[in-house]
Amino acid sequence: MIHRMLKLPERQSCLLFGPRQTGKSTLVRSVLPAGAWTVDLLEHDTAMRYAKDPSLFRREAESKIASGARTIFVDEVQKVPALLDEVHSLIEKHKARFILTGSSARKLKRGGANLLAGRAVMRRLHPLTLQELGESFDLERAQERMYDWKRRG
């Protein structure tokens, strides 16, 4: 795995946004503490259950918190924006730490979603930087490969 320069807060809740395929989920999974609960909203049945009844997420999260989970990771939160209100409530009640990933804060704002102002820090993960790629990245070779790929169609 490529070491990313972005650091997530260790104790505070966090909303991590960025373009698709930039490594948001991979980054979060690499720093999750043991016992964290992960909810993947790319799993259609999971997203549908919570979209149908967002309070189900709160009840399940409270059960996980009661069992000792102190960090809850919700991947692709833009799939079920109503969960942000439940997360807000859970942060207030239980002081649990949430890490939420999504591709577009702008889309959530337009939809009137609760972006947890004052309760979670917002971070943005950009595509890899040259510093993150390090010495193993050969720009000339990459350009040649792109040219070959483009030429072949």
Walk through the language-model features, giving the residues of each:
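Structural recognition of the conserved hydrophobic beta-strand(s) that form the central parallel beta-sheet
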Residues: F73, R97-S103, R124
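Conserved lysine of the Walker
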Residues: K24-S25
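Short glycine-rich substrate-engagement loop in P-loop NTPases that contacts/grips substrate
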Residues: V39-T71
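Pre-Walker A adenine-sensing motif
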Residues: M1-R11
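Hydrophobic anchor at the beta1->P-loop junction of P-loop NTPases
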Residues: L16
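Interdomain motor-coupling "hinge/lid" segment immediately C-terminal to the ATP-binding subdomain
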Residues: G111-G153
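Conserved P-loop NTPase "ATPase switch" module shared by AAA+ and STAND
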Residues: I65-L83
